[in-house]
Swiss-Prot record:
The modification Phosphoserine is found at S14, S16. Residues 19-84 form the J domain. Its main location: membrane. This is DnaJ homolog subfamily C member 5B. It comes from the Eukaryota. The keyword Chaperone applies. Keywords: Chaperone, Lipoprotein, Membrane, Palmitate, Phosphoprotein. It comes from Bos taurus (Bovine). It is a lipid-anchor. The keyword Phosphoprotein applies. The gene is DNAJC5B.
Amino acid sequence: MACNIPNQRQRTMSTSGKALYEILGLHKGASNEEIKKTYRKLALKHHPDKNPDDPGAAEKFKEINNAHTILTDMSKRNIYDKYGSLGLYVAEQFGDENVNTYFMLSSWWAKTLFVIIGLLTGCYFCCCLCCCCNCCCGRCWTKSSMPEEDFYVSPEDLEEQIKTDIAKDMDFPVVLQPTNANEKTQLIREEPRSYCTDS
């Protein structure tokens, strides 16, 4: 089965942001009410059910519907007004919030800056060494303020520390027993909280 592909030139992406307004017959700064009113009028005129003999009516109706969908969505409309259909394509690929970043990074000065920094750092070799090897194999690592010998504790000292901690705990006997807890026990005390640190 052969596929019939027309030999039409594919539409190019505009950057002016006027084609959708021209489809609806409006100027670029048209209000939402004007867009809705014009859309209803053109949709009724070019609807495929009202024009069964016209094969181009369905295509025209699709264009009108697409223009209405984009121009009534404020986010897409702002992108279209600023960057044209190329901006809508970028928004579809990378998200609405990344359109400005894409066009900023694809500008001539951003590309030039990228090339200059690449040349100055030896094709980013210095940046790679700094990140991967911490600036020439650790010469820039911070030194510890305390020497490592202070961290060693002999077993005898550790045993002595444990015995003194136990002896201190014996000086304060447990006086109160915990209250019985059940499902109805409140987790928060009923008395008002006091944030005073003075006893």
